[in-house]
Structures are given as C-alpha cells and as structure tokens.
Regions:
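C-terminal catalytic/acceptor-binding lobe
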Residues: 72-162
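Conserved catalytic core of nucleotide-sugar-dependent glycosyltransferases
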Residues: 2-73
Length: 162
C-alpha cells in the first residue's frame, strides 16, 4: 500500500495542515452538530469540519497542534477514550485545518485480532455515545471551538461546498 506516500505528498502541498486518509464530516442541522461517518462523504476542501480519524493514517506536522496537546490531565478528564476528538480539536484550536488527499484511502487499517472485544469505536459510538459527550466536554472547556466550527460551517455553505 502507498498510504504513507499519499499522506507525505499531500503534506508537501499543505505543510501547515494535518493530512488524513479518513475523516468524519461535521455539519450543522437545525443548529445542532451532526456527522457523516465512514470517510467517503467529505468536504471538497481542507476545513476545520473534517474530524480526523487515525485508523486509516494521519500525518501531523510538529507545529500544527495547540500547546495544550500534552495536557494529560485535561485529556483524561474531557475525552479519555476519544483521542481522535482530542487531536482534531487541538488542531482546530491552533488554527490548523485538516485536508484529505485526492487519492485518500479511507479504509481502516486493522491489525488482525485487535478488533475482538471492546474497541474504542464500540465504546465511543454505541451505548453511552461517549463521542458526543466528550465532544461537548471539549466545547464547554474551550468555548472558542464552538464559534470556530460554526463560522467554518457558514463559510463552507456560502462557498457552495456542501
């Protein structure tokens, strides 16, 4: 597979962005956040509304995340099982958009046998829906994130990207 080359080539074009093969598309519906999962229905340009998911590969240049990225206590308090939310919103807080390569492969890369039993996906997206709880925890902790995401959505809609 050439997934690393695809990410690296995209990084050379966009050195100040996080490049990810798979993203969750965030949008607003009746004033509430909603998502399209799976990595195939994506925004046509780099945006804060691409919630990166690491399961298919993501490249983080060293200067694109907020200084709070290493605040382990805050991470454990706000979204301990949702590292994708943490990394994504630390990028957004730093003013870093997430781009998806044109040749992205959003298929998850799994190590044989690791998906048996509880997984982060089953913990976060089913049952208690920890994904949405933790997302809201982060918006409550960092209110500027909510404003940034809503303004970005308005910009994307005005630009005809939806």
């Amino acid at each position: 597979s050439n997934w690393l080359k695809v990410l690296y080539d995209e990084h050379l074009k966009h050195p100040d962005m996080v490049c990810a093969h798979r993203v969750t598309k965030f949008y607003l519906e009746n004033g509430f956040y909603n998502v399209i999962r799976g990595g195939y229905d994506i925004w046509p340009e780099a945006t804060y509304l691409n919630e990166l998911t690491g399961g298919a590969g993501a490249l983080f240049p060293p200067h694109v995340l907020d200084e709070n990225i290493f605040d382990k206590d805050m991470f454990m308090e706000k979204c301990s099982t949702n590292d994708d939310i943490w990394f994504w919103l630390m990028a957004v807080m730093h003013g870093t958009k997430i781009c998806v390569p044109q040749k992205a492969n959003p298929n998850l890369i799994c190590i044989l046998g690791t998906q048996k039993g509880p997984t982060l996906t089953s913990i976060n997206n089913k049952g208690e829906m920890l994904f949405w709880r933790d997302f809201q925890n982060m918006l409550n902790q960092y209110p500027a994130l909510d404003k940034t995401l809503k303004e970005e959505y308005k910009r994307m809609i005005r630009g005809g990207s939806y």
